[in-house]
Amino acid sequence: MSTSARGRRSSVRRSVALALAIVPLGLAACGADDAEKNGTAAKAPAAPARLKITTSDAGEGFRTVATKSIKGGLVELTFTNEGRDPHEAQLVRIDGDHTTDEAVKAYSAEEGALPDWLRLTGGAGIAGPGQTATTTLNLEPGTYAMLDDADFMGPVNSERGALASFEVTEGAPGELPKSTATVTGIDNKIGPPDHEFEASGLKLGKNRLRFATKGTEPHHVVMFPILPGKSLEEVEKFFASERPSGPPPVDFAKAAGTAVLDGDAAEVTDLELRKPGPYALVCFLTDRDGKGKQHLSRGMIKEVEVS
């Protein structure tokens, strides 16, 4: 059940997309901390720029509307899915003299290297019909596109209208909001493992997650509840197999996940973990050069307890 770094249109990707499509990703902000409740909070930082993206149905395809231009630096993305199908908002920066169509082809390609001019800058994980997802991140100046690869059987959603472009102007980076949990994808110069996750603070229910990467390679994290009687080794074997046998060792219906971030980046996103117990944190991607095994087979699979 392998997936490529961008295309991700394999049976695993479709299964993950179907699972995340029914997860309530659009969450209200986490509760105020004690200082805020007592009226002693420090002065609030500067408000982020607002990036709003909405995808809806349009005949046989989709229609996506996005804010045309925003100030760079700290940005709050609000992604709303008004359609009948699952959608995602993967933000990419397009450097040089390249088009959004080129970006779609490069991102959804099943093989080959990811070009240097296409930078994966985070965004919102898959949102099901009627759901809203919110993520805060820093964006550099440039030309951007929102790509959507949450297809299941046919062409990628971006080829059917789930695509938008926008400009980001100069702005000062800002501090990300406080998080209640952290997951970091790490590239090790001296392995094994070549890649690994560090995680803390994940809990049952709503999480304000800081997802970060340290290194040069892109990562995401997908979190699966491990079914009773199953082990992390069985999970890895299942996902690494082209033709797995038997029932899956994880609960797809209660999975949660993030968009893809290039190396040395961070974002804060709201997601919900709906089942207590052990979870497998998994990265299905490969390196930017398109070579080598999936990151999950190179150390980027981790078990955490959620209560």
Which residue stretches match the model-derived regions?
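Bacterial signal peptide processing site
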Residues: 31-34
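Contiguous segments within soluble domain cores/interaction surfaces
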Residues: 74, 81-109, 206, 213-242
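Bacterial N-terminal signal peptides that target proteins for export
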Residues: 2-19
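Extracellular/periplasmic metallocenter environments
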Residues: 52-61, 67-72, 76-90, 122-191, ...
